[in-house]
Amino acid sequence: MTLLGRPAATDTCAAADSPTGGVSRSASLGTYIRAYIALSKPRVIELLLITTIPVMFVAAQGVPPLGIAVATLVFGTMSAASANAINCYIDRDIDRAMRRTRRRPTAMEQVTPRGTMIYGITLAVLSTVGFVVFVNWLAAALSVFAIAFYIFVYTLLLKRRTAQNVVWGGIAGCMPVLIGWAAITERLDWAPFILFLVVFFWTPPHTWALAMRYREDYAAANVPMLPVVASDRRVMLECVLYSWATVVVSLLLWPIADTTLLYPVAAAVLGVILLAQAHRLYNQVRAGVSGSKLKTMGFFHLSNAYLALLFVAVTIDPLLANALR
């Protein structure tokens, strides 16, 4: 969600024929680079890496092989960036209509649609080839599935049609967990699927908390996010239910992955904090609190911290287990 400075007006058609592949000739090199970085949505990628790195530690039962880990992170970043860039191409009309996203490069015409697609497709091809050559076929296949699911299922099929868009569309955001595990073990087991479900159930309340803050944006863009089409009470009830599912599923990793006590204790403590905040907001809604008085962004930031710290515990646990042996 990088914000770029507003450039002088440019001729889109001229930009499309630019030798730089889609950025106006008048654009500086710095603006050119920043625009393409912004297309990748770095903050979204950061979140994906938060889940990829820890699962490799669990899969390796300690520190993963450095070469495989670095390759997975590099090509995983490229894979996510490709999907995000193509998403920017498809959703450029929505981005122009929303205050939160109207400074994205495609919305501001810093990068042309043609340049955006070339960038996205190139990254998709390079990431897939990189996974095949430097990691393994299973990780490559999962990466391709994640890109295709995000573009065709979430962006094209679900986002503009259903209030459950982020529920099922969130599957793409869960894939780095499986990719990280497959990169190390060349197979899939129950443990990564538990962490997959943690991210799956975590995504809707996290996203809806943000959408409640920007519901007018989504309404203006005709995106039927749950906070746009449902009451605050309904939204917060679902946030509570999905938060409970997140916490319960997170505890299943303890017996399935045979962790030390560090992980379940951390998961329980973090879960109590997450649930307390979700219930607090729900109770406020039931008491009639609404609008700006309902501090949903606090829950949004807390849920970010919850997931990050949970996966820190996932990372540390196998290291502790090795130290105790």
Swiss-Prot record:
Its main location: membrane. Pfam families: UbiA. One of its GO terms (cellular component) is plasma membrane. Its EC number is 2.5.1.141. It comes from the Bacteria. Pathway: Porphyrin-containing compound metabolism; heme O biosynthesis; heme O from protoheme: step 1/1. The chain crosses the membrane at residues 44-63, 68-90, 115-135, 138-158, 166-186, 190-210, 235-255, 256-276, 296-316. One of its GO terms (biological process) is heme O biosynthetic process. It catalyses: heme b + (2E,6E)-farnesyl diphosphate + H2O = Fe(II)-heme o + diphosphate. It is found in: Cell membrane. GO terms for molecular function: protoheme IX farnesyltransferase activity. The keyword ATP-binding does not apply. InterPro entries: Protohaem_IX_farnesylTrfase (IPR006369), UbiA_prenyltransferase (IPR000537), UbiA_sf (IPR044878). The keyword RNA-binding does not apply. Coiled coil: none annotated. It is an enzyme of class 2 (transferase). Residues 1-23 are annotated as: Disordered. Belongs to the UbiA prenyltransferase family. Protoheme IX farnesyltransferase subfamily. Converts heme B (protoheme IX) to heme O by substitution of the vinyl group on carbon 2 of heme B porphyrin ring with a hydroxyethyl farnesyl side group. Carbon 2 of the heme B porphyrin ring is defined according to the Fischer nomenclature. This is Protoheme IX farnesyltransferase. It comes from Thermobifida fusca (strain YX).
